[in-house]
Amino acid sequence: MKIAIVAAMKEELHPFEAHFAPGKVVFAKGPIRFLEVHENLYLVQSGIGKANAAACAAWLCEKIQPDLIINTGTTGSFNPDFSLADVIVSTKFAYSDVDATGFDYAWGQVPQMPADYPVDKDL
């Protein structure tokens, strides 16, 4: 199984890099880095934000074709109930910066799209 572990910032990716032998740089430009640390394992620094995350995922899908992409990091969460290194597993994802409530959509729902996106239960 080919796996890509993605984090926005080098600080979020560092614990994974420290665990593996130095990887081969597959691609690096600006804040974006793709490291191959094993034949079927990639560590990816995507850069911050939805646009960078989407571009990174598209590149991964086209060039690397992973079976699984794991996104890790703070993902914008500053909940005081969470501590550094806590593992939080989501059951669904939603936008946090979309407001079409004036058109009778739920907060975070992009018009004509689902209000949220469930996680693959097999994971």
Language model features with spans:
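N-terminal short beta-loop-beta anion/metal-coordinating cradle
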Residues: 1-64
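Short, active-site-adjacent cap segments at secondary-structure transitions
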Residues: 12-14, 76-79
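Proline-aspartate-enriched helix->loop->beta-strand connector
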Residues: 65-70
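Mid-sequence, gly/pro-rich, charge-dense loop/helix-turn segments that line enzyme active sites
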Residues: 78-123
